[in-house]
Amino acid sequence: MTERVLVTGSSRGLGRAMALRLARDGFDIGLHCRSRRDEAEAVAAEIRAVGRTAWILQFDISERESARTVLEADVEANGAWYGVVCNAGVSRDGAFPALTGEDWDGVVHTNLDGFYNVLNPLVMPMIRRRRPGRIVTLASVSGLMGNRGQVNYSAAKAGIIGATKALALELATRRITVNCVAPGLIETDMTEDLPMEEMLSMIPARRAGRPEEVAAAVSFLMAEDAGYITRQVISVNGGLC
């Protein structure tokens, strides 16, 4: 039986790369999007082209009830997930004195509350299937060491790391591993306007990472062979920290 993996925020960038890699690994993929359904449909077509099944779940991870409704309906129809990749998130950067309450709440609620809103409806069905499972969250180098202009984002991602480690303790005897991948500077459409020369000078590898390199780490943690790896944070950042 082919196992199912849900990847949130999978219509572009890192999420797309992870969904495609996991499909090539042999998983059927649930693609989550908030609004860019046309882009998610394009990713679904790419997944079907490699012989795997793909379908789309559309909801806002910051809206608890709508997320629960969609996720519970999917489990009712298709059964519990083998794996979940919590990738979806947002950032609103700015110096701390200039951050508005909306800047703070929007980033913290979407990123940190999204952890609860996605995983809480899915964990109990994963336990009840009485089989191994995998949960991978996406944090950031900002959550590990902090970053100027990202106090809100750093706080949210540090919270995700803490929540990941705590959930791993709860699920360890259930054979469900819970790990975190923390990317550094990765080439996506979100980095196009950044001062790359200045940023690359701080990275020992002197280059940005590729989405496929982050996807490779997620692929490793999702594999059957990774069953003894849990409660870990894997950094993909060129040696930055």
Place the predicted regions along the sequence by residue:
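Conserved glycine-rich cofactor-binding loop
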Residues: S11-R12
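Conserved glycine-rich Rossmann-like NAD(P)H-binding loop of the short-chain dehydrogenase/reductase
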Residues: F27-E41
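Substrate-binding pocket helix/loop in short-chain dehydrogenase/reductase
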Residues: A95-F96, T100-V108, M199
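Active-site helix of classical SDR
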Residues: L119, A156, T164
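Residue(s) in the substrate-gating loop at a strand-loop-helix junction
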Residues: S140
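Short C-terminal tail/terminal secondary-structure segment
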Residues: M145, E197, S201-M202, S219, ...
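Short, small/polar-rich loop/turn modules that mediate ligand/substrate recognition or access, typified
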Residues: A172, T177, I229-R231
